[in-house]
Amino acid sequence: MHSEPENCVIEGDLTCLIPATEAHLPLLADWFTDPEFVRNWGGQPLTREEVAAKYTGRRRPDVESFLILAQTVPVGYVQYAPAGPGQGGIDMVLLPQAQGKGLGPDAARALVRHLHTVLGWTQVTVDPEASNTHAIRAWAKAGLRPVGRQGSHLLMECLPAHSVSPTEIHDEGFPPRA
């Protein structure tokens, strides 16, 4: 493990997730106005007002928003939204310079583990662009598997193993290998 900030609420091996707040608006606004950052997040840069409304925690409890930190350095954003009892979806985006270092899969594993074990979710879904092979590989490393397509998106999900208690779920959402 590594040194974590005091406000780390979901901890991975390489990352920790902290709730996004209004105090993070300058950072988030810089990120979400950068065409490279949003290339795989809707593709269009957002205004500061849109970022404030969507990504600083104003939509809680409908959408929970987090900064992803590597050590104490912000490297990305992740959110989850319930879609029904025991299920919901995750969206995540990393800074281009943070990609390819295992940070995305680590943050995703930590969040999936939290959703399964703390919140009792039985189904976690993501929907990356089918052309975004980098994201698809990262989600697969986090334990999500393709289950279908919806338009230009690949639907992936992670189900906890049947007949395994939430405390026995391995990082990828499946029981540990023997």
Predicted regions and their residues:
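Short acidic N-proximal helix/loop "leader" segments that mark the beginning
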Residues: M1-E11
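Hydrophobic alpha-helical core bundles mediating ligand binding, dimerization, or RNAP-core interactions
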Residues: L28-T33, V51, Y55
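Conserved beta-strand-loop-alpha-helix junction that forms the acyl-donor binding cleft
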Residues: T125-I136, H153
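Acetyl-CoA-dependent GNAT
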Residues: E22, R39-Q99, H114, L119, ...
